[in-house]
Swiss-Prot record:
GO terms for biological process: mitophagy. GO terms for cellular component: mitochondrion. Disulfide bonds: none annotated. Belongs to the NipSnap family. Pfam families: NIPSNAP. This is Protein NipSnap homolog 3B. It comes from Homo sapiens (Human). The modification N6-succinyllysine is found at K45, K57. InterPro entries: Dimeric_a/b-barrel, NIPSNAP, NipSnap_domain.
Length: 247
């Protein structure tokens, strides 16, 4: 009897001490790197577009002395016109907070650019994004035009749609007519949204490449798989500003 009790006690003890498996709400590779990218979109009054851009051309150096400007574009096609789109890079949220505080106290920046340009802006939007784990920021080989393609995905994150989406992106890249600058996933803003920033030599070379891709069985197969996770999509053709780091 004592032997039986001893064996039962050991069995219960081992069950009690067994490690517990904890569930996680993570939906993809964890974001250990704090670096993020802020997408800012300004809708301008049509009569003020040129004045706004001229002001920034003269004063953008005041702003870029505080944080890195990735690119600055005007929207040529896709949605509302008289619109500009720009991307800013930050090390982390504390870095952005420091930059915003410093800019608010920069008299030269406030007086020469912010105050005159505020009256020219009709609406502002901002999103905080991270690069998808398998993407990195790439600089195009030469000047060109850019396309921002925005994909609204089904909830689940990169763990759900990441592999299929990557295959669809690479299928286009492998045809050689376009380059990926970066693939971004929204952290603040419209969630489950993916932004793909493409570079093309020209709008015509993009059009020719797209026509070719529609007839390529590898692209067709990859896209068919990826659209299973897609809700909607839209795009814009972007023209880089003269002061944009990405030309």
């Amino acid at each position: 009897m004592l032997v039986l009790r001893s064996g039962l006690t050991k069995a219960l003890a081992s069950r009690t001490l067994a490690p517990q498996v904890c569930s996680s709400f993570a939906t993809g590779p964890r974001q250990y790197d704090g670096t993020f990218y802020e997408f800012r979109t300004y809708y301008l009054k049509p009569s003020n577009m040129n004045a706004f851009m001229e002001n920034l051309k003269k004063n953008i150096h005041l702003r870029t002395s505080y944080s890195e400007l990735v690119g600055f574009w005007s929207v040529e096609f896709g949605g509302r016109t008289n619109k500009v789109f720009h991307i800013w890079k930050y090390d982390n949220f504390a870095h952005r907070a420091e930059v915003r505080k410093a800019l608010a106290n920069c008299k030269e920046w406030q007086e020469q650019s912010i105050i005159p340009n505020l009256a020219r802006i009709d609406k502002q939007e901002t999103e905080i994004t991270y690069l998808i784990p398998w993407s990195k920021l790439e600089k195009p080989p030469k000047e060109g035009v850019y396309e921002l393609a925005v994909f609204q995905m089904k909830p689940g994150g990169p763990a759900l749609w990441g592999d299929a989406f990557e295959r669809a992106i690479n299928a286009h890249v492998n045809l050689g007519y376009t380059k990926v600058v970066g693939v971004f996933h929204t952290e603040y803003g419209e969630l489950n949204r993916v932004h793909v920033l493409w570079w093309n030599e020209s709008a015509d070379s993009r059009a020719a490449g797209r026509h070719k891709s529609h007839e390529d069985p590898r692209v067709v197969a990859a896209v068919r798989e990826s659209v299973n996770y897609l809700v909607s999509q839209q795009n814009m053709l972007l023209i880089p500003a003269s002061f944009s780091p990405l030309k």
